[in-house]
């Protein structure tokens, strides 16, 4: 049965002197929408023309799939569309110019005895024909990258192989990649957001596995002067987190690491305000998750479909959590 559950939490302003805020004097509503058809984590998520696409990922095992699940906001329902051309996990996806672009990732990868291959392939999905078309590949093969769209172009930074600092931008109209200055802090499994012509990258880890050293660093790339700048770090180091820009704010969710507790998953919803260089901790995710590569914002709600509920890639879930936040940063 389809149910919508809302949790409304009124908060009080508590400012600290070191640039971090625990709470904000604005309500934050957490709720739920129709669950995914199949459990998933480490998948690519993007919004295109009012629909949310969930591409590839791990179901409840570390065997990647080619499934593409589509959520229709208007009917609160999921469907399955044309499979991705290959099994995939840890890819990036964005919706731009009427097409869904899926970039890089890893093929197959299953368990300790299965070999994983990083790929540079880029495919575009046309929702009108439900077909995939191959496009120009990335300059380097990688997965678990930071990505977002700024002024119609797709920026992709870092990722695995471990300690990757590659940074490039893709122009969908020209079908061309351009290499940019390296990400200063090489890392993977981080969150990113494009705000006012700048590309923000937060958190991540330095090694390949989820027990690797993690970071709280925040670095920002100015797409005009082509320079990186360090900003205030997150209040706590996290990897396997995800992020999205809403009303000029950089929202980050979840993450994984043994320091997060028994499940190894962070419940954090922490927001960065570029105008004040401050981080604000909003009410936690009701069901903590990691491994949702990309989020979707539509009709005033941020959608977090699926995600892993324990460290690693074998705990994909069907949860579809949403949050309505009134915080504005512009």
Named regions from a protein language model:
Residues 21-330:
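Kelch-like beta-propeller repeat domains
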Residues 4-12:
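Sec-dependent N-terminal signal peptides
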């Amino acid at each position: 049965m389809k149910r919508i559950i809302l949790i409304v939490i009124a908060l009080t302003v508590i400012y600290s002197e070191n640039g971090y805020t625990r709470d904000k004097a604005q309500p934050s509503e957490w709720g739920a929408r129709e669950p995914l058809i199949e459990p998933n984590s480490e998948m690519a998520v993007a919004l295109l023309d009012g629909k949310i696409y969930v591409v590839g990922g791990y179901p409840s095992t570390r065997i990647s799939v080619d499934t593409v699940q589509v959520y229709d906001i208007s009917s609160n329902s999921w469907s399955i569309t044309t499979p991705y051309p290959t099994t995939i996990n840890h890819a990036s996806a964005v919706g731009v110019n009427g097409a869904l672009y899926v970039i890089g990732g890893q093929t197959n990868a299953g368990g300790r005895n299965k070999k994983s291959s990083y790929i540079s392939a880029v495919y575009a999905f046309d929702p009108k024909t439900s077909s995939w078309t191959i496009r120009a590949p990335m300059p380097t093969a990688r997965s678990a990258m930071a990505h977002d769209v700024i002024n119609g172009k797709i920026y992709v930074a870092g990722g695995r192989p471990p300690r990757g600092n590659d940074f490039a931008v893709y122009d969908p109209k020209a079908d061309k990649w351009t290499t940019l200055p390296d990400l200063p802090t090489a890392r993977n499994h981080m969150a990113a957001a494009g705000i006012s012509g700048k590309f923000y990258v937060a958190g991540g880890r330095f090694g390949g596995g989820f027990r690797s050293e993690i970071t709280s660093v925040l670095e920002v790339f100015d797409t005009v002067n082509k320079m990186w700048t360090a900003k205030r770090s997150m209040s706590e180091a996290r990897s396997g987190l995800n992020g999205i820009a809403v009303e000029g704010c950089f929202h980050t969710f979840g993450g994984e690491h043994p320091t997060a507790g028994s499940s190894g998953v962070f419940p954090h919803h922490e927001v960065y305000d570029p105008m004040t260089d401050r981080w604000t901790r909003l009410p936690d995710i009701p069901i903590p998750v990691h491994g949702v590569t990309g989020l979707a914002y539509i009709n005033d709600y941020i959608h977090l479909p699926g995600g892993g509920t324990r460290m690693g890639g074998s705990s994909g879930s069907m949860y579809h959590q949403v949050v309505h936040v009134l915080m504005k940063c512009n």
